[in-house]
């Protein structure tokens, strides 16, 4: 089976290629923006923008579209270019190459609301309002894929962590080191979240590539929701990092984040705001996924969430020499 993967120089894409490079039944080809990479030499890697994808001399059986902007902050134009237009370019490539199976790596952020949500199913109502431009752009990309005439499916994974991650744990741990974390206090229902290790997500991407009859969409997670504040506290204790001292109510934090976003957007200021409304929502409200379809078609996850967390923490200790 020939698999073409976009976003090959990114966190998830590079992990997928390294994870399955020794599979004799797979021929892996990756497309990424970076000219330099640390991928195994047996991976056919092309440093190519997706607008030039038609120049690629490959006829894949499966295309996994994992490229895109994952940062929680950016302009609508940034997300349109990186998440919507790139999907359109990948679809055009697939049409030119005989309609291979297409797997879009979307996000559970399409469901996000400033409210508690439990066991969200794939057919849940989405939009018209979104908590982030990121979630909005991912849903726009999904709409394009739904119109593709070949085999296709959409993955909506939860938050992903692991070696190479720069968006989930690193910013939190960096803020904790500086004593900048704030605890968001919800007195009624504690925030919960689904998280999963990157290797587990990659396993499910490969299972989807091989599965005979795909559904239109799958929620993807480890199936072990965590209480967000308690989980973060446990991680910080294991790394001997300070726990949050200051507390804010979600409504106050949302107002602060909204003001900061306005300042960053209209002044404009460099970089990202220290907090965003999307981030406040993640740590203030419960958001868990129903993964019945994933389990029925692809089976249970290999490994456990707890062991994956411990593996990541050991990697973090090694990289930061914190113990």
Identify the function of each model-found stretch:
Residues 37, 47-85, 89, 93-97, ...:
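NAD(P)H-binding glycine-rich loop region in Rossmannoid oxidoreductase-like domains
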Residues 236-284:
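Terminal hydrophobic/aromatic helix or amphipathic segment near a protein terminus
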Residues 289-323:
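Amphipathic terminal alpha-helices
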Residues 89-133:
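Conserved Rossmann-fold NAD(P)-dependent oxidoreductase catalytic core, especially the SDR/UDP-sugar
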Residues 163-165, 190-200, 218-238, 247-258, ...:
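Substrate-binding strand-loop-helix patch
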């Amino acid at each position: 089976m020939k698999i073409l993967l976009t976003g090959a120089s990114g966190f998830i894409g590079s992990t997928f290629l390294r994870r399955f490079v020794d599979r004799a039944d797979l021929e892996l080809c990756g497309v990424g923006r970076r000219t330099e990479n640390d991928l195994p030499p047996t991976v056919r890697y092309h440093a190519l923008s997706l607008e030039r994808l038609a120049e690629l001399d490959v006829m894949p059986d499966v295309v996994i579209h994992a490229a895109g902007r994952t940062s929680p902050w950016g302009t609508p134009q940034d997300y349109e270019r990186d998440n919507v237009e790139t999907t359109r370019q990948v679809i055009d490539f697939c049409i030119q190459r005989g309609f291979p199976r297409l797997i879009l790596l979307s996000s559970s952020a399409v469901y996000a609301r400033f409210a508690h949500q439990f066991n969200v199913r794939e057919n849940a109502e989405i939009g018209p309002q979104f908590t982030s431009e990121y979630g909005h752009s991912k849903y726009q990309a999904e709409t394009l894929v739904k119109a593709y005439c070949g085999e296709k499916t959409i993955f909506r994974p939860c938050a992903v962590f692991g070696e190479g991650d720069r968006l989930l744990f690193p910013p939190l741990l960096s803020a904790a080191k500086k004593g900048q974390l704030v605890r968001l206090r919800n007195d009624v229902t504690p925030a919960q979240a689904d998280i999963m290790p990157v290797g587990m997500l990659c396993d499910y991407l490969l299972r989807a590539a091989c599965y005979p009859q795909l559904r239109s969409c799958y929620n993807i997670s480890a199936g072990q929701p965590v209480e967000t504040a308690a989980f973060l506290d446990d991680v910080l204790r294991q790394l001997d990092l300070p726990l949050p001292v200051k507390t804010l109510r979600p409504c106050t934090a949302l107002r602060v984040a909204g003001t900061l976003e306005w300042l960053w957007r209209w002044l404009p200021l460099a970089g990202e705001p220290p907090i965003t409304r999307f981030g406040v929502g993640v740590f203030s409200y419960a958001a868990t996924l129903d993964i019945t379809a994933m389990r029925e078609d692809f089976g249970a996850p290999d490994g456990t969430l707890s062991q994956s967390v411990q593996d990541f923490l050991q990697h973090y200790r090694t990289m930061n020499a914190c113990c």
